[in-house]
Amino acid sequence: MMACCLRNKRRMKGKLSWKSKKRDLSHSGNWAPEDDNDEGKIVFFGGSNYTFDLDDLLAASAEILGKGAHVTTYKVAVEDTATVVVKRLEEVVVGRREFEQQMEIVGRIRHDNVAELKAYYYSKIDKLAVYSYYSQGNLFEMLHGKLSFCIPLSMLLWYAVSKTNNSTFAGESQVPLDWESRLRIAIGAARGLAIIHEADDGKFVHGNIKSSNIFTNSKCYGCICDLGLTHITKSLPQTTLRSSGYHAPEITDTRKSTQFSDVYSFGVVLLELLTGKSPASPLSLDENMDLASWIRSVVSKEWTGEVFDNELMMQMGIEEELVEMLQIGLACVALKPQDRPHITHIVKLIQDIPTNFNL
């Protein structure tokens, strides 16, 4: 894919510089010998009409959307009319060449159900990925609520370096979702994951499927973001893997995620859509019982109706559809990887759910 490179030839005056000596370089990741003379550049993918550079990003108005273990996410308004999502990557464990190769694979993926990678930036000190912005927020926010706040991006970037608390910001912006909305999100996200798995000659893996990485596009279908980041950043701590509720039981290193484990994570998202429960929330007296285990336990007692979100149960005539989706979700979270369905089969199963909605 054709790309346009804009080199960072000047530093900001009076604002935090990417090259600031105050910055902590200990989390900059592996630094390959070929990187020594690279001062950093923004690479835009073909078809992008953006003209901003690094200084424009730093000076732009920004809103922090969340902070994960190795990624801090910002909503950034540039060029007056353009709004993008900027992800600042920490604990990057690959050199420039491998980083760029991964970004090029992601940058070639163009689909309505996959968030578009607009550009990336790589230097010795900082690594950024610039994605499309989705105004409706992510699925986690819709189901469980979340609060974000607005301060200048340069201050946020400095704050992110020293911040050690990996928790998200809780709020009350929960959005009621009817069954049609949840079904559209599920179908779209399944299609997006199928496209992702086709990339790199059918070998590509997302590695971090979860509701906070699923947005809705202009047609209200699910759209997957954050692809390409898992394999270039340090693996999540074991405590985070287990407590998140999304990762397959066989995964002990997120950099070694597989398409089978992606399907497991997607299955958890389906169960989250059906129950309205966060996979990370306590679900029983047993602290080790995650969402998938809790649902298996309830279903085994033939109390299937108890698992569904009360908001869904108030809708008439959708019980059979809910049960069919539940069966798909449970198939995805099979304990043995080889027992999980292929994502293309999952797409067909969801599309074949009989419904009165025009999807």
UniProtKB/Swiss-Prot annotation:
Residues bound to ATP: 65-73, 87
Every Protein kinase domain range: 59-357
Transmembrane segments: none
InterPro entries in the record: At_inactive_RLKs (IPR050994), Kinase-like_dom_sf (IPR011009), Prot_kinase_dom (IPR000719), Ser-Thr/Tyr_kinase_cat_dom (IPR001245)
Family matches, as Gene3D superfamilies: Phosphorylase Kinase, domain 1, Transferase(Phosphotransferase) domain 1
GO molecular function: ATP binding; protein kinase activity
Domain of life (superkingdom): Eukaryota
Pfam families: PK_Tyr_Ser-Thr (PF07714)
The entry's keywords: ATP-binding, Nucleotide-binding
Entry comment, domain topic: The protein kinase domain is predicted to be catalytically inactive. Lacks the conserved Asp active site at position 208, which is replaced by an Asn residue.
Family named by the database record: Belongs to the protein kinase superfamily. Ser/Thr protein kinase family.
PANTHER family, per the entry: OS05G0588300 PROTEIN, PROTEIN KINASE DOMAIN-CONTAINING PROTEIN
Protein name: Probably inactive receptor-like protein kinase At5g41680
Native species: Arabidopsis thaliana (Mouse-ear cress)
